[in-house]
Amino acid sequence: MNNNPELTAIDVLLTPDEIIVKKALEINKQLMEEYPNGFKLDESHIPHISILQNYVRTKDLEKVYKAVEKVITSENITSLQLKAVKLICNGSIDEQGVAVIVISPVEILLNFQSKLIDILKPFMENNGTAAAYVTSEDDPNINDSTLEYIENFIPDHSGSNFIPHITVGIKGMESLEKLVNEPFTPIIFSPVSIGVYQLGNNGTASRVLKEWTISRTSQRILENIKKSYIK
């Protein structure tokens, strides 16, 4: 018996539509201009709403996809409408504040997360290492805060502790505080796809493993969104 199975760090997530993606890209561009060492939202750092992050056995990924698909069919995600309500500083990375757009939690999201946790438990493992993540020449290491965050995602970020959000970049704490205090007009939007992604450093959704578009219209929207990353 293998007591140290190969693991993959995954993120089951929602890809939002172009309305909120446009806002996320605008904020990210501003943050990058003021802090070039931050991360740019692109196809390797997509704007998304994380529902569940955890380690699963790599050999069970196909079973994970089937389990996620089963939950998708049981929830009315196709009619889901969400509201982005504010921009906040949500923790820090290397002494820089993390800027996120907060989404109002709704019952469907909470149910979706709860069912995902239950159905994926047989495939989950603890004590994941950097080998479970996507790395690159530009970002070759996985920091300890990422490893800790994913390890503790379920107790710290599920149920009553779940704060749906879209991470849009990082910036110095003092200047970010000024940005989050600016007026934020609420935005109504919908998800266009549900995906299982492999995580990169700092919880970025780096590599799509499996994706389900919500409708034919959503497929076209998703394609247009991905084109917008390279503009």
Describe each model-derived feature in a short phrase.
Residues 101-102:
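A short, structured beta-strand-centered segment in the mid-to-C-terminal lobe
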Residues 1-92, 106-195, 201-231:
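Basic, often amphipathic N-terminal segments
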Residues 93-97:
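Acidic/polar active-site rim loop that often engages polyanionic ligands
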